[in-house]
């Protein structure tokens, strides 16, 4: 089990009931011992936090975070941390920031 803070910034909060910050407690397969990964977090977000399933494509594309969304793990680009394979730790802050803006 792991406690993390998840932030949706740059307008992404619009698909999450306009709430920018969420505190989550996650378990993998109802096990307290198995590590929870960022991939598990993304699955949880898609399955439980996006109300309108038509909005999933705003966040996800081809099974991963959509291009144009900067993903940070504790202020470090997730590509440097192993992307979806990163094992979450208590107190981690995962930020998703849309860099795409209409105009």
From Swiss-Prot:
Keywords: Cytoplasm, Isopeptide bond, tRNA processing, Ubl conjugation pathway. The modification 1-thioglycine is found at residue 103. SUPFAM superfamilies: MoaD/ThiS. Gene3D superfamilies: 3.10.20.30. Pathway: tRNA modification; 5-methoxycarbonylmethyl-2-thiouridine-tRNA biosynthesis. It is found in: Cytoplasm. Pfam families: Urm1. It comes from the Eukaryota. GO terms for biological process: cell budding; cellular response to oxidative stress; invasive growth in response to glucose limitation; protein urmylation; tRNA wobble position uridine thiolation. The keyword Flavoprotein does not apply. One of its GO terms (cellular component) is cytosol. GO terms for molecular function: protein homodimerization activity; protein tag activity; sulfur carrier activity. C-terminal thiocarboxylation occurs in 2 steps, it is first acyl-adenylated (-COAMP) via the hesA/moeB/thiF part of UBA4, then thiocarboxylated (-COSH) via the rhodanese domain of UBA4. There is a cross-link at residue 103 (Glycyl lysine isopeptide (Gly-Lys) (interchain with K-? in acceptor proteins)). The keyword Cytoplasm applies. Belongs to the URM1 family. Acts as a sulfur carrier required for 2-thiolation of mcm(5)S(2)U at tRNA wobble positions of cytosolic tRNA(Lys), tRNA(Glu) and tRNA(Gln). Serves as sulfur donor in tRNA 2-thiolation reaction by being thiocarboxylated (-COSH) at its C-terminus by the MOCS3 homolog UBA4. The sulfur is then transferred to tRNA to form 2-thiolation of mcm(5)S(2)U. Prior mcm(5) tRNA modification by the elongator complex is required for 2-thiolation. Also acts as a ubiquitin-like protein (UBL) that is covalently conjugated via an isopeptide bond to lysine residues of target proteins such as AHP1. This is Ubiquitin-related modifier 1. It comes from Vanderwaltozyma polyspora (strain ATCC 22028 / DSM 70294 / BCRC 21397 / CBS 2163 / NBRC 10782 / NRRL Y-8283 / UCD 57-17) (Kluyveromyces polysporus).
